[in-house]
Amino acid sequence: MTDQRGAICGAATLVVKVGSSSLTLPGGGIDVRRVDDLVDALSEVIAVGRRVVLVSSGAIATGFPAMGITHRPRTLAGKQAAASVGQGILLAHYASRFASHGLRVGQVLLTVNDLVRPTSYRNAWSTLDTLLGLGVVPIVNENDTVATGEIRFGDNDRLAALVAELVRAQALILLSDVDALYTAHPDSPDARRVEVVEDIDTLDVDTHKAGSGVGTGGMTTKLEAARMATCAGVPVVLAAAVDAPDVLAGVPVGTYFRPLATRRPRRLLWLADAATPQGQIVIDDGAVEALTQRHSSLLAVGVTRVHGDFQAGDPVTILASDGRVVGRGIAQFSHDEVRVMRGRSSAWLAAEMGPAASREIIHRDAMVLSRRRKAEPSSRNQKSSGSRVTS
């Protein structure tokens, strides 16, 4: 049995993401045959006792023809209006087709804020887990109607990766109009299908294939989603939506991304992939070694600079002196306190500021180390599409 077949066939919980272009017609509106084929394939999987979360795009592309508009809206307000119309139409069709298999569906609309706030993150998990436990098929989409440019995922690929982590899925399947990852643009005569990816960071491929005319995602976002999922221990398959039955049966089609790590504790999932860092803490080389080689906590003595306006309990990015991202963590002190404490030994802090000040700036159990190199922006209003931390 191949790795891909074993990963898919052995998965008790699957997250399946399907893009707009695989659900709707080129001019907008539901492609009934393709939606029905997808639902039929998923229903067969559910019938044998496996759990499926469907992350579905397509609300905007479904909605704008119903509003009498001939082209996909370009303004945020236009897109939100189309989404409000299309989401109901799309869900109704899903509900009808799943009902023909004796299954119920539940709509789950999420925004970035739902997954960057710990309380909302836990509530989202509880809702999805309850639906799955009741035998209901959760259909997840970004809440385009209320999301603004500053607080939106912008694509459902990364949302699907977060949902896969959230529900502790054993596999993530990304379905679109692209049948696999290629070494070059698929139209190029030199393009070769990449069958298996061991480590995304070592890939040498051209990802500049734009998203379809009815969706927002492209190959770059799919690779980012695959990175997020595999670094959380979730295997990923990227394939064409028309190949969904084969993918679900474990047939080695598309591109298979092997997981890179064991699963993180649930408390770290939010921090690693969903949290928005509120500041940056720069540390010296000794502290970098202590964190990365000995998995130590971050002490004040190793801090050299502080950026941003964070409070105790906020997520922050940990940077090396050369700007490399070391990881993320939950600060135990505010930015003002860390500025005063930086470079001081624990003994000095205890003597001069009291025992509480000698605590770790970031405890090792509230820290996720990174494989990434690029620094993240520091702002309370930064977009969620910044660099992700992967352990």
Curated annotation (Swiss-Prot):
CDD domains: AAK_G5K_ProB, PUA_G5K. Residues 278-356 form the PUA domain. Its EC number is 2.7.2.11. Its main location: cytoplasm. GO terms for cellular component: cytosol. InterPro entries: AceGlu_kinase-like_sf (IPR036393), Asp/Glu/Uridylate_kinase (IPR001048), G5K_ProB (IPR041739), Glu/AcGlu_kinase (IPR001057), Glu_5kinase (IPR011529), Glu_5kinase/COase_Synthase (IPR005715), Glutamate_5-kinase_CS (IPR019797), PUA (IPR002478). Residues 378-391 have a biased composition (Polar residues). It catalyses: L-glutamate + ATP = L-glutamyl 5-phosphate + ADP. ATP binds at residues 17, 176-177, 216-222. Keywords: Amino-acid biosynthesis, ATP-binding, Cytoplasm, Kinase, Nucleotide-binding, Proline biosynthesis, Transferase. Pathway: Amino-acid biosynthesis; L-proline biosynthesis; L-glutamate 5-semialdehyde from L-glutamate: step 1/2. Residues 370-391 are annotated as: Disordered. It is an enzyme of class 2 (transferase). GO terms for molecular function: ATP binding; glutamate 5-kinase activity; RNA binding. One of its GO terms (biological process) is L-proline biosynthetic process. SUPFAM superfamilies: Carbamate kinase-like (SSF53633), PUA domain-like (SSF88697). It is found in: Cytoplasm. It holds the Pfam family PUA. Substrate binds at residues 57, 144, 156. Belongs to the glutamate 5-kinase family. Catalyzes the transfer of a phosphate group to glutamate to form L-glutamate 5-phosphate. PANTHER family: GLUTAMATE 5-KINASE, ISOPENTENYL PHOSPHATE KINASE. This is Glutamate 5-kinase. The gene is proB.
